[in-house]
């Protein structure tokens, strides 16, 4: 069984960033495990014409290594969007564009493994290694980073979710008829 220097559990933007930065390190082995079959970033919140609240320079790698091949600017070049982006003088990008960038980066990384549901993590004090067990494999690692994201939090008064009551993370996956109806948003941040 191969021993990795680093195993990441969950592949969201945080661990995707670590994967992109770790990929180019000589003599450093890393593996990132995700239960989903492919990368996706908030698919239920891809509201048309909704823009990021942060600069595109806060991508996966630019703050640490601006010349990394997984930068947002390189994504624009590879997708033949760079000159269009330059001429529009955008300071922020749409959530859909940023999601496409993240998928592009995930598609270009070789240290990601999808459809790998982590079932157990244990630490062997004797050899100083973590053992990470999935439904199909076992891995050993010197270091582990858990980046599984947040779980939705609904008030106790919400007993069922349907097209009349749901979490904002599912907004674009549902098709409620809101015409002429009153809508209440509970919470804030990205959804409020």
Predicted regions and their residues:
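Glycine-rich nucleotide phosphate-binding loop and flanking beta-alpha elements
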Residues: 15, 39, 120, 151-152, ...
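Glycine-rich dinucleotide-binding loop and its adjacent helix/turn
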Residues: 94, 148-192
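Helical element adjacent to the flavin cofactor pocket in flavoenzyme catalytic cores
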Residues: 95-113, 118, 147-152
């Amino acid at each position: 069984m191969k021993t990795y220097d680093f195993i990441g559990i969950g592949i969201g933007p945080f661990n995707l960033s670590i994967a992109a930065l770790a990929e180019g390190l000589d003599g450093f082995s890393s593996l990132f495990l995700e239960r989903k079959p492919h990368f996706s970033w908030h698919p239920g919140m891809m509201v048309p014409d909704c823009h990021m609240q942060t600069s595109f320079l806060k991508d996966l790698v630019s703050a640490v290594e601006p010349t990394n091949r997984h930068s947002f600017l390189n994504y624009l070049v590879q997708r033949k969007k760079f000159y269009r982006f330059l001429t529009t003088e955008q300071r922020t990008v749409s959530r859909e564009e940023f999601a496409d960038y993240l998928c592009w980066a995930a598609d270009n990384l070789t240290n990601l493994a999808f459809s790998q549901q982590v079932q157990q993590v244990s630490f062997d004090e004797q050899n100083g290694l973590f053992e990470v067990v999935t439904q199909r494999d076992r891995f050993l690692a010197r270091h582990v980073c858990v980046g599984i994201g947040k779980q939705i939090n609904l008030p106790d008064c919400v007993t069922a979710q349907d097209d009349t009551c749901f979490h904002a993370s599912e907004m674009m996956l549902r098709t409620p008829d809101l015409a002429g109806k009153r809508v209440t948003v509970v919470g804030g941040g990205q959804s409020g």
